[in-house]
Curated annotation (Swiss-Prot):
Residues 258-361 are annotated as: Head domain (RuvB-H). It comes from the Bacteria. This is Holliday junction branch migration complex subunit RuvB. SUPFAM superfamilies: P-loop containing nucleoside triphosphate hydrolases, Winged helix' DNA-binding domain. Residues 185-255 are annotated as: Small ATPAse domain (RuvB-S). ATP binds at L23, R24, G65, K68, T69, T70, E131, D132, Y133, R174, Y184, R221. One of its GO terms (cellular component) is cytoplasm. It is found in: Cytoplasm. The keyword Hydrolase applies. It comes from Bartonella henselae (strain ATCC 49882 / DSM 28221 / CCUG 30454 / Houston 1) (Rochalimaea henselae). Keywords: ATP-binding, Cytoplasm, DNA damage, DNA recombination, DNA repair, DNA-binding, Hydrolase, Nucleotide-binding. Homohexamer. Forms an RuvA(8)-RuvB(12)-Holliday junction (HJ) complex. HJ DNA is sandwiched between 2 RuvA tetramers; dsDNA enters through RuvA and exits via RuvB. An RuvB hexamer assembles on each DNA strand where it exits the tetramer. Each RuvB hexamer is contacted by two RuvA subunits (via domain III) on 2 adjacent RuvB subunits; this complex drives branch migration. In the full resolvosome a probable DNA-RuvA(4)-RuvB(12)-RuvC(2) complex forms which resolves the HJ. The gene is ruvB.
Length: 361
């Protein structure tokens, strides 16, 4: 991930030593939002406990900051088992995975974040481990090489990914419980902000909590981060209570607008609007123009803009919707207004209406 993105206020990537970790709920009943996912998990956990068996493998899918890691930790607590955590890029060799799996006890939970970044070789070792609870390793090299099978404790693999499409079908099919997490509503985030304020021993009004919640991009992690910055502002201003005025002033200073867009989002939208006349424009071109890696744009910037209806992804590239033009205070080009079919162009459409076409996008 790009260095600047790691430090971005509205980035949903967890920061090192992030104090918001202390705000995480410890049981499912305290977890706010994701109602359908919580209800289903509660049933699956109770069933596994009643059978005294390991819970089926779980795959969480969704943008960063929605609670995938928190739910994994809660699952281990509810099951009364140990929790082990790692991430896809960390598991570089077969020995790394073997060390993790052989140290698991019966019914333990192993959490792998960013599982889509596992190498194909590691995936091949993971298949029998998930299905048969066995490790099939090759010891030695050349003619002296031999296959060794190691029995494992029956464990639960909980994996998280922001990019479901990058998972191979064999790996994806081995998860018995796939769960998609969605962006939170403003009401849910408002409740989270009020809860966090109580934990901080900070007084906040309903309209103050609402102001923070509506700028949090549907993401609890961002809501907690914004609340901390508003608390800093209120402390320096000697405000006894965070109200809408204090929250608005603080967030405006941080250049977070009323829909939760920050300078990087606006750079993205302005680039497509002003340089490429609303698109279509390929993701590689956008990444080069913004000096940001493609993954950061696809995983961090675009999901919220798509959910809010600012942009559309097409086979030809990214296109701005009317909502984006209005938010930027710009007029859409006449060609966009006259040809709405540009937003839903079939693959066999005339290439003359395409402004920028990139085969590699």
């Amino acid at each position: 991930m790009h260095k600047d993105e790691d430090q971005r206020l509205l980035g949903a990537v967890p920061l090192p030593n992030d104090p918001d970790r202390s705000l995480r709920p410890q049981v499912l009943d305290d977890f706010i939002g994701q109602e359908a996912a919580r209800a289903n998990l509660k049933i699956f956990i109770e069933a596994a406990k009643a059978r005294q068996e390991a819970l089926d493998h779980v795959l969480f899918v969704g943008p960063p900051g929605l609670g995938k890691t928190t739910l994994s930790q809660i699952m281990a607590k509810e099951l009364g088992v140990n929790f082990r955590s790692t991430s896809g890029p960390v598991i570089a060799k077969a020995g790394d995975l073997a060390a993790l799996l052989t140290n698991l006890e019966e019914r333990d939970v192993l959490f792998i974040d960013e599982i889509h970044r596992l190498s194909p070789a590691i995936e091949e070792i993971l298949y029998p481990a998930m299905e048969d609870y066995q490790l099939d390793l090759i010891i030695g090299e050349g003619p002296a090489a031999r296959s060794v099978k190691i029995d494992l404790a029956k464990f639960t693999l909980v994996a998280a990914t922001t990019r479901l499409g990058l998972l191979t079908t064999p790996l994806r099919d081995r998860f018995g419980i796939p769960i998609r997490l969605n962006f939170y509503t403003i009401e849910e985030l408002e409740y989270i902000v009020q809860r966090n304020a109580r934990l901080f021993s900070v007084q906040i009004s309903e309209d103050g909590a609402h102001e923070i919640a509506r700028r949090a991009r549907g993401t609890p992690r961002i809501a907690g981060r914004l609340l901390r910055r508003v608390c800093d502002f209120a402390l320096v201003k000697r405000a006894k209570k965070i109200d809408r005025k204090i929250a608005d002033e603080a967030l405006s200073r941080l250049e977070v607008d009323h829909l939760g867009l920050d300078p990087l989002d606006r750079r993205y939208l302005l680039l497509i609007a002003q340089t490429f006349l609303g698109g279509p424009v390929g993701i590689e071109t956008i990444a080069a123009a913004l000096s940001e890696p493609r993954d950061a744009i696809e995983d961090i910037i675009e999901p919220y803009l798509l959910q809010q209806g600012f942009i559309q992804r097409t086979a030809r590239g990214r296109i701005l919707h009317q909502k984006a033009w209005s938010h930027l205070g710009l007029c859409a080009p006449a060609s966009t207004q006259k040809h709405p079919q540009l937003f839903d162009m079939p693959d066999n459409a005339s290439r003359q209406t395409v402004l920028w076409d990139e085969a590699d996008d």
